[in-house]
Amino acid sequence: TQNIGKGWQGFLNYNQVSDDRYFRELTPNLAQTSLTNLSQQGGVTYNGRLGANGTISFTGFAQRFQTIQDPLALFVSPYERLPHFSMNAIKRNVGKMDFELNGSWTNFYHPTEVDGKRLVFYPNVSVPLRNEYGFIIPKFGLHYTNYSLDKAPVEATHKGENIDRT
């Protein structure tokens, strides 16, 4: 992680080996290593103030993997997130209420599986009730998720459709 300045940071985590035999040459049993998917990820984050009683943060990154395959036990590599964006905003003590907004958008990619995009949106409001003998914090929110699938098989029910969940 590297501080860029004024609330911005950049990060890079890139792992790669020369070939699928890399770990087998170190040990005869690939299961003896815990690394089968090497993360390759980089992105930026921002953390800042949202007025006197608030904060806001953004994250954007891309992530893929180098999958080390054992020819005797092949498996499907994980989905890549190309890209992923998220945002969180909190504003506290506005008329004795706290407001929060969380959201993210991710493009999932896989060379052989169904691709898709996911949108998550979660606005919520809470009313902190505190005194010297205890507290209770009622909270109301709406959690919305939308999936848009690509490359689905012809017989799939949701090919080219959006799948919503609230």
Report residues per predicted region.
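Outer-membrane beta-barrel proteins and related beta-barrel translocases across Gram-negative bacteria
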Residues: T1-T166
